[in-house]
């Protein structure tokens, strides 16, 4: 059961046999607690014990070949694990087909290289980095541009015409200035 679970996890998350498994928070996960769980399928109940053991050994070896070296040694089954990982050309052939199935995965990494993340100051798992990159892309679309500093608007006054427009304004401008009043603004130079 542990080898089957190990194979499923390796295939699902794309980890290689030498890397330790990590959860979403980057902590290492151990599968040793799943090694001794008996299989839940009921197909072995009606068969003879001798035939069932041979089938189980062949099936276990095949699963271990697919899984590589047991996902970094987390599979602590007996000698069949050691025999299965030292198959030579068979193991390499199975691994090469396994890697070909995972060929689309590197394209995600190439996207990551094109758009480098700003958060390279600490180590993260690849899943967390991909989600961070996606979050940055999504939020950058909705962010407004930086505020533009206000432009200094200098009010320029146009000079007033020398002659008043109305007859009343003419009359007022012709009066001599009194000590309490100021000269009209039209006569002040700017």
UniProtKB/Swiss-Prot annotation:
Myristoylation and palmitoylation (probably on one or more of the nearby cysteines at the N-terminus) enable membrane-binding and Golgi apparatus-specific targeting and are essential for efficient packaging. Keywords: Host cell membrane, Host Golgi apparatus, Host membrane, Lipoprotein, Membrane, Myristate, Palmitate, Phosphoprotein, Virion, Virion tegument. GO terms for cellular component: host cell Golgi membrane; host cell plasma membrane; host cell viral assembly compartment; membrane; viral tegument; virion membrane. GO terms for biological process: viral budding from Golgi membrane; viral budding via host ESCRT complex. Residues 44-58, 130-139 have a biased composition (Acidic residues). A lipid is attached at residue 2 (N-myristoyl glycine). Residues 80-90 have a biased composition (Basic and acidic residues). Residues 14-190 are annotated as: Disordered. It is a lipid-anchor. Residues 108-123 have a biased composition (Basic residues). It is found in: Virion tegument; Virion membrane; Host cell membrane; Host Golgi apparatus membrane. HAMAP family: HSV_CEP3_betahv. Belongs to the herpesviridae cytoplasmic envelopment protein 3 family. Interacts with cytoplasmic envelopment protein 2; this interaction is essential for the proper localization of each protein to the assembly complex and thus for the production of infectious virus. This is Cytoplasmic envelopment protein 3.
């Amino acid at each position: 059961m542990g080898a089957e679970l190990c194979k499923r996890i390796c295939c699902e998350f794309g980890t290689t046999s030498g890397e330790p498994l990590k959860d979403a928070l980057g902590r290492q996960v151990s599968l040793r607690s799943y090694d001794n769980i008996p299989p839940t399928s009921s197909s072995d109940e009606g068969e003879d014990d001798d035939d069932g053991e041979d089938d189980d050994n062949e099936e276990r070896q095949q699963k271990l070949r697919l899984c590589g070296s047991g996902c970094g040694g987390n599979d602590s089954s007996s000698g069949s694990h050691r025999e299965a990982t030292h198959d030579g050309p068979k193991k390499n052939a199975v691994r090469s087909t396994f890697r070909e199935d995972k060929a689309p995965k590197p394209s995600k990494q190439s996207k990551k290289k094109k758009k480098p993340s700003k958060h390279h100051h600490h180590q993260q798992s690849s899943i967390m980095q991909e989600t961070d990159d996606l979050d940055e892309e999504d939020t950058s679309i909705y962010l407004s541009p930086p505020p533009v500093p206000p432009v200094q608007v200098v009010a320029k006054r146009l000079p007033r015409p020398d002659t008043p427009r109305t007859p009343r304004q003419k009359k007022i401008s012709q009066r001599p200035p009194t000590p309490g009043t100021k000269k009209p603004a039209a006569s002040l130079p700017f």
